[in-house]
From Swiss-Prot:
Pfam families: LppC (PF04348). The keyword Signal applies. Residues 309-359 are annotated as: Disordered. The lineage of its organism: Bacteria, Pseudomonadati, Pseudomonadota, Gammaproteobacteria, Enterobacterales. One of its GO terms (biological process) is peptidoglycan biosynthetic process. It is found in: Cell outer membrane. This is Penicillin-binding protein activator LpoA. A lipid is attached at residue 27 (N-palmitoyl cysteine). Regulator of peptidoglycan synthesis that is essential for the function of penicillin-binding protein 1A (PBP1a). Keywords: Cell outer membrane, Cell shape, Lipoprotein, Membrane, Palmitate, Peptidoglycan synthesis, Signal. A lipid is attached at residue 27 (S-diacylglycerol cysteine). Interacts with PBP1a. The gene is lpoA. GO terms for cellular component: periplasmic side of cell outer membrane.
Amino acid sequence: MLPSKIVRHKAGRFVPVLLAGLILAACSGQGPKSQSVDIQAPVTNNSAYYLQQVQQSSDDSKTDWQLLAIRALLKEGKYPQAAQAIGELPNQLSDKQQQELLLLKAQSLVAQQKIADAQPILSQVKTSELSQDQLARYYGLQIASAQGKTSLALLRAYIAQEPLLKGDERQQNIDATWQALTQLSQQDMNSLVINADENILQGWLDLLTAWHANAQDANMLKSAIKDWQTRYPDNPAAKTLPTQLSQVQNFTKASTSTIALLLPLNGQAQMFASAIQKGFNDAKNGTLATAPQATPGSAQDPIAINQQQPADANAVVSPSANPAAAQQSGTAQQPATTQQQPQQQPAAEPASNAQVKVYDTSSQPIAQVMQQAQQDGATLVVGPLLKNNVETVANSQTPLNVLALNEPEQIQNHPNMCYFALSPEDEARDAAHHIWDQGKRQPLLLVPRNGLGDRVTAAFTKEWQSLGGGTVLQQRFGSVSELKQGINSGAGISMSGTPVVMPSSSQPQSVSVAGLNIPAPQTSAPAASSGGAIDAAYIVSTQDELQLIKPMISMRTGSRSNVALYASSRSAQAGAGPDFRLEMEGLQFSDIPLLSGANPALMQQAAKSFNNDYSLVRLYAMGIDAWTLSNHFNQMRQVPGFSLDGNTGKLSATADCVINRKLTWNQYRQGNIVPAS
């Protein structure tokens, strides 16, 4: 028999082993422990991962995984799958889960442009129960719901979201806040009523006021921004300026001591070039006629001579230019009675000592002309005029600053290049804005069946959709003889058309608003409209064509049609009699300010110089504005929101420094031409 103490020793060693085995057995019986789920945190994985977690979960966390999977599906633009997943959620949700579901439903609707359905859902969200990440998403949805329309609610959403963001997202918020502010007109500013404790919003509005007051002088704007930063040190923009305004800090004025003016002095475009050159020189020498203000009844008839669009793609791009236009003798045409209101005088630079040398681009290759201009010490190039030459210069990587007088087919963003053209595309973009601003949402384009119609259609549609518009319809027409056959047969023109289908590359692939990524839903091509919904028609035609098109529209729609009619300057002519003006009753048309009464004295001077050929007057005005733009080259490139009241329109620049022209819109009313209302 073994000693008792030996037995006790062996038993003592056995007990811990037995306990460990029991513990391990108990743990294995419980199964793997579930991962913790936080539905209020950011989504960091793709939808496949979260859907897998849903399949593997059987406890209370399954619903949380479902909600995360829905967020991931929405982030990836998989809206049908997200909708199906929402339908599979249990009816009973916790308060936290219910708030997350409201955000997900709203996001799905906003992404599918169902804003009216999303807004009441957002109103149910209890912001006090949201995490910081959820709050950022909530305000992002409020911002996206605004669809780019600036309002106090939108500004407040940006301001509320800003402290919830970091890094690039925060800078994007500041930039977007500033962009929204710059959309406010002075009338909008005057109508804003904010609370006394909204110091951040007040600071933003004061920054906008400082910008408006000093935008035309970069140095004054620098000083105004610095003063504003001192007065509002706690404003987020005081610590990190909007990107556009930060560029002002590095602004330096471009040298214009020696300007090279590149024009074709021979060939078909010579007449155009001469008009531009005269306008440029008259502006440089300070010999432009001026008047204190345009007064009611004193404005020239805002109409232009009948011209055909150049067929050559390299021709001068002018909305109504024709190198073979017949010259009219005598002094300026006596205008029809107008009722223009006083307008601001276009900007005019004083006489300058700058040296201007003209180079003939029709006598040698443009590359040689540019090289010669550089060797001659040019600090700024104005031109060339022909499109193929502009494309060559854009591809040449020249070190010189260039104000091209045309646009290439594909705009290239160069820090030393701007593009200024009188093009039908430019008019079409302006028309899209004008029609949109008048509250129209279902436009029809009536354009010729040729390349001009293609260009106008593409430009209008792209701009329209950038404003938030939907489908644009188009209807093509043929020659005058075809239109006459139509009117003689009583066919008329119906307010219907086929949808304009833009290349897929031009369609937005996603929308990123204040840190919230909302992919654009995939949509099929819209079906043709049968009419009835159209509320506006933009007509690009000559006057002869318009005289047939408008009555043909009335034949089908009646004289009391609610469709508003708009026309480009192509259909406006000098000398249109009272019968024509009465026939055009109600139609609105665009033209440059110089032909719309902005400066009657200069208009008379120009009309006399060009024998009342208003197509050349337009190019003369272009030359004047080219001089003004050359003296503000770096402002156009670097100072956000910089604009000029030019003779060809209110001039501003895109991010690629394409000069946009906001035109003057007039209307035929009871035989008179009046400002469009």
